[in-house]
Amino acid sequence: MQQPARTKYRKQQKGRNKGIATRGAKVSFGEYGLKAVGRGRLTARQIEAARRAMTRHIKRGGRIWIRIFPDKPISHKPAEVRMGNGKGNPEYFVAEIQPGKVLYEMDGVDEVLARQAFRLAAAKLPILTTFVVRQVGG
């Protein structure tokens, strides 16, 4: 699972996830990509589960790039703890996803296999996604 090696601050405010992705919106490394249509948060576990599903399906063929990184800590207070007494401890990390963001890329496999692999990966993710092909010269 991915997580930052170290962070400047242990905890972050919740914030808002507005707008559409302008950076990371094109297929840059591979030939095919899995692009987010919806918005939301992906936990490090979900990112890893989708990666495993794709890797198992393509069986050593091709190469996969993960274009997102879970860099936002999410804190939780323990169960049955009274309100107050500060913010809870960081429990896991998430990546904030806007519509248009390319999540994964793949190369070295044919399109049919890539579509099947991305469909398996998309089933592991809580947001809507679509299959995209790299645009030549653009």
From Swiss-Prot:
Protein task: Binds 23S rRNA and is also seen to make contacts with the A and possibly P site tRNAs.
Assembly behavior: Part of the 50S ribosomal subunit.
Gene behind the chain: rplP
Family the entry assigns: Belongs to the universal ribosomal protein uL16 family.
One BP annotation, GO: translation
Protein name (Swiss-Prot/TrEMBL): Large ribosomal subunit protein uL16
InterPro entries recorded: Ribosomal_uL16 (IPR047873), Ribosomal_uL16_bact-type (IPR000114), Ribosomal_uL16_CS (IPR020798), Ribosomal_uL16_dom (IPR016180), Ribosomal_uL16_sf (IPR036920)
Region (Disordered), start-end ranges: 1-22
One Pfam family cited in the UniProt record for this chain: Ribosomal_L16
Composition-biased stretches (Basic residues): 7-17
Disulfide-bonded cysteines: none
One function term, GO molecular function aspect: structural constituent of ribosome
